[in-house]
Amino acid sequence: MLRDGNKQSKNNVRFVRKSIKTTVKTSLQNRSSLKKPPVGRSKSRSISSIPSSAVASTLSLPEKVETKCLEEDTQGESSSSGNKDPTTKVLDVTAKPKSKRRKSFTSLLVNGSKFDEKNGETTEPEKLPSIDDESNQLEVAEYVDDIYQFYWTAEALNPALGHYLSAHAEVSPVTRGILINWLIEVHFKFDLMHETLYLTMDLLDRYLSQVPIHKNEMQLIGLTALLLASKYEDYWHPRIKDLISISAESYTREQILGMERSMLKQLKFRLNAPTPYVFMLRFLKAAQSNKKLEQLAFYLIELCLVEYEALKYKPSLLCASAIYVARCTLHMTPVWTSLLNNHTHYNVSQMKDCSDMILRFHKAAKTGNLRVTYEKYINPDRSNVAVLKPLDKLPL
């Protein structure tokens, strides 16, 4: 009986101890749950002396976390926390809700590169109107920038040909001018396209810059260049017998075909060149030109074809300068616009020397010996632009 009573008392003690532990554990859980913020609210807590590895792991979490490092007073915070280290930092970690759209790294770089608008340092580019008609499929507005990027690149890679005749013993700038003046007349008689004329001059000069020739071959090379250009650019090309006839039977069919093969081989079949014509088309659109401005600009650039001096300038600069001189001659204001500056890549100061040269050609056109271009543009179909009085000098 005594043993049974001792066993029962021991069991009662164990039951009481077990119930006490359960009660204490429950109270501790309730106390810790009171410290937790309600679900759905953003939680903020201060963490003292977090190692850099922990911060890196926190930033790599999927949720966006904004971390701010605050320097605390060494006496205030360290005394309360018991930390005596004066370099103690407190990190305020605030959890933010996920954004629907993540920002790309490029957008962050762009935003970081902007100047402060409050300091007035922003340099936002001027919004210029488009010069392309996207509704017109023939203008290939989707590809026009890529096309002209090719022309700009090709022009930069091709050196200027302003001194190539110094290597020729029998060909002079005067001889070249006479040949080109005659080719302009032949081109006009055959009623070929503008593109054909400018490509003819490009093929002629490129070939002469690479191959030494005799004086009696000049006309043969000119006619062959015209034949190649018309095959590449025009709807039709002159027959070889017509070219022989217009040269007063100076050459045979075999000679023309042989020169055609020689030119193609020497030029490596590269016929798509950045001629002044392709730049003129684009720049006139940027100038929002009327017919008179267009005809005068083409008249001035065609005067440059005959002059060997003009070869020292790039085709794009020649076209931009021709439009500038034409606008000044017609007293248009402003003489140069932001749209022209954007599409030509030239400002007025960069065109000064070239513009002065073109104005000199304009003054001499009426009384010069090579008058085919002057007589061509004195026609009413070309707005009689050749009769316009040249300026005494260009505005500063």
Swiss-Prot record:
Residues 39-57 have a biased composition (Low complexity). This is Putative cyclin-B3-1. Keywords: Cell cycle, Cell division, Cyclin. Residues 1-98 are annotated as: Disordered. GO terms for molecular function: cyclin-dependent protein serine/threonine kinase regulator activity. It comes from the Eukaryota. Pfam families: Cyclin_C, Cyclin_N. Belongs to the cyclin family. Cyclin AB subfamily. InterPro entries: Cyclin, Cyclin-like_dom, Cyclin-like_sf, Cyclin_A/B-like, Cyclin_C-dom, Cyclin_N, Cyclins_cyclin-box. GO terms for cellular component: cyclin-dependent protein kinase holoenzyme complex; cytoplasm; nucleus. PROSITE patterns: CYCLINS (PS00292). Residues 21-32, 76-85 have a biased composition (Polar residues). One of its GO terms (biological process) is cell division.
